[in-house]
Amino acid sequence: MAPRPAAAAVFVVGAVVALLLLPPPAAAAPVGVNWGTMMSHPIHPSAVVEMLRANGVDRVKLFDADPWTVAALAGSGVQAMLAAPNDQVASLARDPHRARDWVRHNVTANVNAGVDVRYVAVGNEPFLKSYNGSFINITFPALKNMQRALDEAGFGQRIKVVVPLNADIYSSPENKPVPSAGSFRKDINTLMVDIVNYLHANDAPFVVNIYPFLSLYHNPSFPLNFSFFDGATKPVYDQGMVYTNVFDANFDTLVWSLRKAGVPDMRIIVGEVGWPTDGDKNANIKYAQRFYNGFLRKMAKNIGTSLRPGRMEVYLFALIDENQKSVLPGRFERHWGLFTYDGKPKFSMDLSGNGKGNLAEVKGVQYLPSHWCVFNKDTKDKYKDLPASVNYACSNADCTPLGMSGLVLLEALQRSQQQMLHKEGACFQYMF
């Protein structure tokens, strides 16, 4: 489990807000959110829950079952998807007792405390090609052990086990890039058929993460406007269906894949969907706002897709920027949040999809006094070790927002000092 932040952390709220004192929640939004906590200065969970309620968000998807975070959901009316992270999948697959212990500590205890747990996720995107098959032989056994543990604890009918999967597990051939040609990846097709039939037999949904931004990021020739929902693109036609955006086309490719796997009516949840605001030429406020405005309008209308009309269950990715995430997938990884690291909305947005109102920010965030790093004019050869100084600073701070245009030493050191809580010496040898 992730350790709790130190008491000196910048964004710890001074007083925990009792849930009984929270204002009544706003009208429920048509979407949930992913709440990640990989940040150097986490906002107090109780303050985040208050913000969720103020914005009408009644569902969250977590990436673990951290007690400090989950406890804040007790009595809040916010439904939760808890998760056993990828580093726990092997032990869950190997030992059924581990699954029972996991359920006892993370499900039974939290449900008894008033947390509305709806799903338990086993791993996260375990079949990504970048994992080189590390989870192929252990995910299904872990899934079955977790399901048995929930059944034994009496939760099997109300809490469903799922495996959130990336959209790279299915595709259409290059010579026929339409949804009806879609199927599961050849290397995992048999496994996926087994998994989806097992999930379906237990009345559990298929959870898929769909990212139009990544279609654009990985393919420079991808038509930009096909990433959005305003119809400003050439449509794709497929067996009488018309697709004007990649989200719908991707979703229906999954529908076809499930049909071919023998579960045509399987329920689908979109576990992650969103647009980053920094770290790439196409990751910016303008495009993020365009994406969300179109997507939320679509969700509010409950129109679904060509093959699955009606209401969809979706979780936006993500709630708050996480400055401790790995940037191996890209510099944008730390900038998916609807809110900045200190809980402020990045842009005007209405989760109801009606185009009215703005996001409510996190209340009660406290800040340390402002300090600044400046050059010491008496330092000799102050430019000699400039690259080393930048590397030093960026080893402590998130420098990805400036990655597209080059990084200024003072800015890097300033970020480093903030992350190190203004410790003496954090400005390094070129500062005073």
Predicted feature descriptions by range:
Residues S46-W68, Q79:
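Catalytic domains of carbohydrate-active enzymes, especially glycoside hydrolases
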